[in-house]
Amino acid sequence: MRQSIHLLLFLAIPGFVPACQRDMAAHRRAWEAARPSSYVFEYQRTCFCPASGAWWRITVKRDSVTDAQLIDSTGVTRGLRYIHSLAQPTLSELFTEIAANLEPATAWARVDYDPQWHFPINASGDVVDRTDSKWTLIVRHFRSM
């Protein structure tokens, strides 16, 4: 209980989330400046949501998804019936998704970025006063085309 109170107090410190958002904004600007016109990457989203845990290979051309292939669904336990109807993001859209997850005042996130391209490679977060709100995003095998 004591640790929970300290965590909530830490999250209530003004500037905690804005610092994360400023860092993310700097990486997003660097990504947008360096972003190739076409690229491929694999990613996985985990959350308390349908199709959580699936690995996708995403092809992007001119900042639009042109192909999304499900490459591994062995860890998926819910949402298999409509997994292929889910929209998949570009790397630019992952920044927007992470920022949206930081909107609640009690939200936190940790984001690691690719050192060359500056897109998120590993992000996780939670909203501490909501049940089942923990999420992760993992990006791997990025390749410029």
Report the location of each language-model feature:
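Short, surface-exposed binding/anchoring microloops in extracellular/periplasmic proteins
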Residues: 45-62, 67-70
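Positively charged n-region of N-terminal signal peptides that target proteins for export
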Residues: 1-5
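A short, Trp-centered hydrophobic/proline-enriched beta-strand micro-motif
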Residues: 34-45
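Bacterial signal peptide processing site
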Residues: 21-23
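A short, structured loop/turn motif at beta-sheet edges
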Residues: 32, 59-66, 114-117
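Bacterial N-terminal signal peptides
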Residues: 7-15
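Mature, soluble, non-transmembrane domains
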Residues: 44, 75, 80-145
